[in-house]
């Protein structure tokens, strides 16, 4: 039997702290996975469901985008993947009776954890203007409401069409097609808040905004650098790949402000030896200060240039552009400035250099620790410089590896979910569908929030996700959402965005990855693209949580027919009945998807082409891989201030809160904690266990306050602190973003810590 949802929010006023762990996974991970799954699904459903996760005839995990190996284990999932599946396949249900019992104002007082624990949404729900409660409505009435508001807009650009990274390729392609037929490129997505900096940097330097390695490359590498990433919590199956790489002789450098259990030791639950002893992963830990990565890679590049024979001159001469300007800037790198920026010692950097020079095949992996700073784009460009110098792109066992978060965030971008589409993509849409797509750039996430705030956007439609909790500057974001005429969320579960609404609001319940999708032509499957550009099918097997659910492609197709009417030549009804017809159109519009239906029938899927990886061909403006030379930047702190990074707990995936613990960091039963270096804490007079308010400081002079955080003395880098989001998103200014990519700078928030009334 599955457990019942919590009746009230659990008390979190006394978190328990035991200190960080030094190994990840193992028997505890198995126990936590199964316990949480059984609470949501019961014993039988847990077994039947988890054995289908990431299998060739099963469904793609709705969690992270880490690729599946060619040879799958019987249990091809991690602890957090099991939690994600359990959340979706839960037996708990949110019915119209629930909404009758809870006003929207009441829901707004509840925690994200409590909201998510209530279960699966079962019927379309409508909040009328001035009403206190959502009420059930038929699907056709829901589509009528959306159509009323969209067709009443003065311009299509007053509508926003947001996408979460769980959305399938088929749904994403139809969604962007509908938005563009409607007349706007306002297609903000979750990538704007995470790896936009990666895409911006990689497009300019190597000509494609994706990583250049496949899973097999990790097993061929001599050196893997993992920078600004915590695989043990955010991509646990990556630890298996790193373990295999280590067994093959690879060495690993970890660059991060926090020591993380997963990168110290991995206890592989797939093997008896792994569960008992585990494998040490990191050979060298560089405990860098937040935002110091550009300075580190710049100095490493200088040292490579200064080492005779270290530069791959043949590769540089044949395949790159801008080398001389870059080399001049790199040779000017200063040791003292680098040590200040990074907080590292000269000895540690020298040791890293020795490992770099000993490697013929190097991969650099990274995540949000590199992408969410003001200078993130030049930082990632410097990583590319580092790899280009020694010919480490377009070679087996080498390359760039931005590790994406949500399961199809990369696929959604490939399908055209982008506010700044390439002209060639729009030309292909025009040829295939016979309409003229808009050419002007649309709004990304930050600009979309500004547009709602300034009454330039009036309808907000979200295909999945939890926009309010994912976005920066919480008070500004929530006020902006409340100015909209209509907010619409296609969702599987209840979340805070359903309680922060426009004048009118709709919740449209949809099928999950785990569920069967029956349409007019029979049972359907969808496809996804993983973090390494592999495309494969996903087939749900469970009966839908409610007879009233529609799939995401069906929702888009029906809405498009209602809004666009007879003026659209697109066969929306055909697309809803048979997703193979959608894939046929994708094959004709998007390069790399030729013979899509035939190729995706392969149980292993197929790899999308990647010119730098496959041919050492770089489709940039220069026709070569571009070295770049930007001034070195790093955050400079006023006295008595700390640099805060927002991050996830182990019981969390993006904005979904599975529980109130952070097992690997030793935190239990509470999320309002701030991790502070003990020496910094002593200088600031912060006792371990005391309570503090986090107060953001930025150039606009606005006070942004997150009250009541328990101080935890923790071995983070000096001058740095860490706390969980979404609780700390209130501290991230809307306009504090990365240059070029406009990604919120959530990893470099200047804060002061003031004594809390909770003491």
Segments predicted by a language model, with ranges:
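Flexible, low-complexity linker and terminal segments
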Residues: 79-93, 161, 380, 384, ...
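Sequence-level motif detector for i,i+2 pairs with an aromatic at +2
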Residues: 56, 116-118, 156, 359, ...
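Cofactor-/ligand-binding subdomain signature composed of acidic, glycine-rich
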Residues: 35-42, 50-157, 257-360
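Intrinsically disordered, low-structural-confidence terminal and linker regions
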Residues: 1-58
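Long, structured ligand/cofactor-binding scaffold of large enzymes
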Residues: 134-137, 141-220
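Long, low-complexity segments enriched in small/aliphatic residues
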Residues: 575-663
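Non-catalytic alpha/beta scaffold blocks inside enzyme catalytic domains
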Residues: 196-396, 403-585, 640-643, 647-759
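Acidic/polar N-terminal loop/beta-strand segments that form early-domain functional surfaces
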Residues: 124, 162-164, 645-647
């Amino acid at each position: 039997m599955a457990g019942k949802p919590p009746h009230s929010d659990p008390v979190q006023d006394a978190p328990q702290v035991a200190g960080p762990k030094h190994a990840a996974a193992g028997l505890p991970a198995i126990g936590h996975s199964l316990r949480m799954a059984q609470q949501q699904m019961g014993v039988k459903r847990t077994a039947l469901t988890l054995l289908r996760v990431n299998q060739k005839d099963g469904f793609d995990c709705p969690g992270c985008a880490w690729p599946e190996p060619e040879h799958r284990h019987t249990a091809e999932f991690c602890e957090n993947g099991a939690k994600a599946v359990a959340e979706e396949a839960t037996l708990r249900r949110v019915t119209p009776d629930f909404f009758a019992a809870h006003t929207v104002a009441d829901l707004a007082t509840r925690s994200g954890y409590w909201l998510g624990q209530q279960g699966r949404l079962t019927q379309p729900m409508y909040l009328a203007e001035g009403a206190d409660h959502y009420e059930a409505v038929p699907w056709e009435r829901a589509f009528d409401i959306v159509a009323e508001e969209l067709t009443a807009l003065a311009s299509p650009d007053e509508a926003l069409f947001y996408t979460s990274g769980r959305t399938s390729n088929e749904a994403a392609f139809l969604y962007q097609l509908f938005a563009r037929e409607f007349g706007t490129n306002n297609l903000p997505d979750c990538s704007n808040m995470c790896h936009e900096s990666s895409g911006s940097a990689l497009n300019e330097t190597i000509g494609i905004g994706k990583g250049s390695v496949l899973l097999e490359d990790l097993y061929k590498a001599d050196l893997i650098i993992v920078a600004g990433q915590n695989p043990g919590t955010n991509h646990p199956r990556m630890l298996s790949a790193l373990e295999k790489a280590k067994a093959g002789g690879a060495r690993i450098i970890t660059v991060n402000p926090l020591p993380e259990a997963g990168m110290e030791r991995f206890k592989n639950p797939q093997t008896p030896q792994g569960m008992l002893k585990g494998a040490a992963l990191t050979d060298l830990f560089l405990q860098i200060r937040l935002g110091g990565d550009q300075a580190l890679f710049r100095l490493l590049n200088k040292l490579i240039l200064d080492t005779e024979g270290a530069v791959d001159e043949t590769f540089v001469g044949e395949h790159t552009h801008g080398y001389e300007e870059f080399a001049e800037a790199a040779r000017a790198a200063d040791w003292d400035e680098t040590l200040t920026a990074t907080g590292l010692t000269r000895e540690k950097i020298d040791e890293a250099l020795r490992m770099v020079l000993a490697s013929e095949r190097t991969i650099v992996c990274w995540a949000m620790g590199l992408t969410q700073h003001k200078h993130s784009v030049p930082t990632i460009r410097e990583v590319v410089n580092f790899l280009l110098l020694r010919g480490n792109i377009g070679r087996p066992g080498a390359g760039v590896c931005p590790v994406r978060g949500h399961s199809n965030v990369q696929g959604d971008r490939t399908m055209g979910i982008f506010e700044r589409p390439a002209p060639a993509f729009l030309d292909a849409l025009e040829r295939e569908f016979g309409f003229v797509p808009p050419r002007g750039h649309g709004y990304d996430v930050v600009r979309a929030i500004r547009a709602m705030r300034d009454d330039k956007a009036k309808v907000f439609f979200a295909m999945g996700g939890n926009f309010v909790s994912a976005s920066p500057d919480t008070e500004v974001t929530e006020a902006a959402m409340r100015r909209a005429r209509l907010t619409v969320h296609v969702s599987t579960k209840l979340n805070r965005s359903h309680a922060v609404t426009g004048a009118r609001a709709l919740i449209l319940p949809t099928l999950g990855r785990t569920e069967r999708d029956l349409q007019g032509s029979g049972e359907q499957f969808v496809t996804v693209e993983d973090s390494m550009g592999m495309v494969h099918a996903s087939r749900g097997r469970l009966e839908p949580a409610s007879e009233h659910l529609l799939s995401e492609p069906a929702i888009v197709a029906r809405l498009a027919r209602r809004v666009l009417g007879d003026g659209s030549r697109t066969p929306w009804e055909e697309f809803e009945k048979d997703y193979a017809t959608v894939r046929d159109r994708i094959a004709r519009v998007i390069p790399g998807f030729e013979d899509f239906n035939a190729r995706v029938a392969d149980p292993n899927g197929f790899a999308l082409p990647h010119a730098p990886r496959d041919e050492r061909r770089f489709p940039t403006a220069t026709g070569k891989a571009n070295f770049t030379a930007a001034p070195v930047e790093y955050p400079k702190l006023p006295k008595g201030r700390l640099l805060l990074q927002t991050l996830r707990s182990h019981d969390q995936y993006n904005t979904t809160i599975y529980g109130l613990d952070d097992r690997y960091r030793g935190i239990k039963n509470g999320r309002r904690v701030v991790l502070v270096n003990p020496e910094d804490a002593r200088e600031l007079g912060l006792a371990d266990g005391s309570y503090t308010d986090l107060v953001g400081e930025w150039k606009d002079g606005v006070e942004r306050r997150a009250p009541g955080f328990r101080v935890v003395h923790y071995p983070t880098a000096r001058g740095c602190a860490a706390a969980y989001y979404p609780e700390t998103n209130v501290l991230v200014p809307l306009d504090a973003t990365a240059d070029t990519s406009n990604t919120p700078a959530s990893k470099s928030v200047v804060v002061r810590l003031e004594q809390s009334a909770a003491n």
